[in-house]
Structures are given as structure tokens and as C-alpha cells.
């Protein structure tokens, strides 16, 4: 490594710091939850994606322990060698049934799943049409596919249709977050499906933040989308599900094609079987989780009522557990986040380039594990500081 290369890194790091864009990894001790120990201090956390409070649920912990005793720690091989365990298959079967699709495939992460699906189904002769606010993994997947990459303005279906109509690609795929992670708004699934049918395109929906929460826990698909063979559905499993990984659900022929051709699936060691055991229990808890979801929605309503009318910040329009409080400048968002932390409330600032310039925000996320008092404390403290 040359001194010049390292010097360029030093200059780049200094520039990130000067622009209030340098990031750090807060250090968690103990289990995830509404109240956590971060960097040695006890705080109320409003920044995890553990929407149903399942990450430390005793039933999931017990399921993982039982599988650990019976299966050990690691899978030991890729799925197509000797790492595909009975527990993986049982979870895939249960997941497909729960979300209303014929078949499913388990991946180690959502990022990996997105790379696998897009690159396996779209070639260099294809075209990917993506909402401008999609998750970074969908952007990277489209770029790695080698296909033409067309991004349309957030939620602008007219622009999407004009680009579909102009496309001469052999294969087309519309890709979209289902719940957008930085704004909390929800994609118009049936309208996207209309366009996919009209222009003979796949519709790939990343439901990282809707699965377990929307539609009784089954996620953001409409009944029509569940029945469509052109709709491919992704749920990540480290958020509302409380564990780790991701699962893709689709027509059985799509899933078999991914097994045979998706390089991120083929050339990756399988996830530990104990995670699949915990995920099966998570599905049971999600299915029986009406009370958790009801409590979560009450928290959303209380927060939105309590933080309406702030002078120097505004809540984005969202009915999901993602409640972005838009502040504006990076420095202002950091200042508010740090002031809340001094009061024992953890809500990190989200800055450029994750969100557009001048829309830095506190990304408040709510959980069924929060108490009414936790939410009231957040509302009161934001009013004092914002």
C-alpha cells in the first residue's frame, strides 16, 4: 500500500468529519430491547427495527437453544453442498404459506437476497426500473446485474410508465421498497402490478419494514399481488421477525431458478440452523401477535398526536413504526440527537447521503416493547429541545 493511497484516505475521512458525515458504531451491551445499554449508559432506544419486541422474546430464545443443542452452531457448508438443514426447509415451507406464495428461499441477509434475485433474473439485455428512494442494496443489485438501470422519481408512476413504454429490453423488472425505510411511506402495490402486467415486467417488492407489521403480520402484499406469478416478495427477518436473514417468496419456478443460478445463494455458507429454528417460532409469534401490533399502532398514534405542530421540525407522513422527524441541516439533526442522548433517549441522526440534502432527520422507530411512558417521555423531551 502506497503512502499516497493512505494519505487520500486520511483526507477523505477528514472531509467526512468536517461535513458532519462521519459515522461511528455505538456499542451495545446485553440484549436488544426498548431499554438498552449503549456505550456504557442505560437509555430508551427509539432506533431499532425490533418492531414487535421479538429480538429477546423467551420463546425465540428457547427455540434457538433447543436447536443449538441438537444441531450445533454452524451450518458447515453451502446449501447445495451439505449445509441445507431440515430446519431451513421447514422455515421456508412455513414462510411461503404465511405470506401466501407457493415457495420460498432463505438467505443470510436481505442485502444478499436482493443481489441474488435481481442478478439471477435480469441479464445485460434487461432493464431495471427502480424508485429513487429504494434501499441501497436494490441499487447495488441493479448495477451489478449489468442491465440498463432506470430510476424514477419517488412514487411517480407516470414517469415509471413512460420509461417502461420506451424500453426495448428483453427482460424488465420493477423493483421497489414496500415500506420506504427513511420516510415510512408505503408503495402502491396494485398500481405497480398494473404497470408490470401492462409492460410484461417482473415486480420485485422489498418488504423489509412491513413484514410482521402490516396486514395482520403477513406484510404489505395485496391479495392480488399474492396470487400473481410475476410478483416476487422479500421479507427481511432481523426487523419485526426479531432474528436475522431474509426470505424470498415467489412462484416455485422462480425459486428453483434462484437455487440453480443465483450466485449469492450458491456461493455462500448456509445460515446456522438455530436461526431457522428461531425464525419458525417467530412466525408463530407473528401469527399470534395481534396484541403486539395493536400496541404498536397505539404508540404510532400517540407519537403523531404529540409531535404535531413543532416549529423547527416536522414528522413525515407515515402510519408505520418508522416516524421520521425531519430537521433539515446535518448539524442540526446531530445536535438534537446528542441533546436527546444526554436525556437518556437514543434516536440517531440520519444524514446525507442516506437521505437527500437538507432533509437530515431523526428516524424514530417504535416498538411494541415500548411502554406508554416511554413514548410520552420522548414526546415531552422533543418539545423541550426542538
UniProtKB/Swiss-Prot annotation:
Keyword field: Biotin biosynthesis, Pyridoxal phosphate, Transferase
Cofactor(s) demanded: pyridoxal 5'-phosphate
Enzyme Commission number: 2.3.1.47
Entry annotated with the keyword Membrane: no
Family: Belongs to the class-II pyridoxal-phosphate-dependent aminotransferase family. BioF subfamily.
Subunit composition and interactions: Homodimer.
Name the UniProt record assigns to this protein: 8-amino-7-oxononanoate synthase
Organism of provenance: Thiobacillus denitrificans (strain ATCC 25259 / T1)
Gene giving rise to this polypeptide: bioF
